[in-house]
Amino acid sequence: MILSEFIYGGMDGVITTVAIIAGILGAEIAPKYALVLGLASLLADGFSMGISRYTSLIDVSKAKVTPFMSGLATFVSFVLIGGIPLMPFFFLSFYDETWIKRAMIWSSALALLMIGAVKGMHTKKYLKSISEIMVIGLAGVMISYHTAKYVKGHLIHGI
C-alpha cells in the first residue's frame, strides 16, 4: 500500500509543481516567482494530499498499513518528489533563466522517470510504467503552459 501512496503522491507532486512553473513561464511572469509559488503550493498541496488520504482511510481501512502511515507516505512523496522540479529555481542568482528552464525540464523528467521506475519494479513492466508516467506528466505540463499562455494573451492584457 505504501508503494501506491509513493506513486500517487510523487506523481501528483511533480505534475502540480511543474504545472505551476509552466503556468508562470507560459504567462511570461518572472521565473523568480516560481520559487515562491512553487514552495507554497508544494507544502500546502502536500499537506492536503496527505491529510485527505488519512481522513479517507481512517474509518474504513482494514489494511495492514495504518491511515496515518498512508497519509504520511503520500505527503512525504508529494513534497520530496514534487520538489525536484523546483530545485533549479534555488539557483536563480547563479544561472540565467534559460539554464534554469532547461534544468527544470530535465529534473522534472528525472522525477517522473523515478516514479515510473518504482512503479515498474512493482509491476515488472518497466517500459510501460515509465512511458505511462512520462506521458501523463507531459500532458499536465502542456495543459498548464498553454492555459496560462491563452489566458495571458486573450483574457488578461498587461500582465
Regions found by a protein language model. Give the residues of each.
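Hydrophobic, small-residue-rich transmembrane alpha-helices and their short perimembrane loops
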Residues: 1-88, 101-107, 111, 140, ...
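Short helix-capping/hinge motifs at transmembrane helix termini and TM-loop junctions
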Residues: 27, 89-93, 122-123, 152
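Residues that define the loop-to-transmembrane-helix transition and helix capping
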Residues: 31-32, 98, 127-128
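Membrane interface segments of multi-pass transport proteins and intramembrane proteases
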Residues: 90-99, 156
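Transmembrane alpha-helical segments of integral membrane proteins
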Residues: 108-124
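Cytoplasmic-side transmembrane-helix entry/capping segments in multi-pass membrane proteins
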Residues: 127-136
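Juxtamembrane boundary at the C-terminal end of a transmembrane helix
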Residues: 145-159
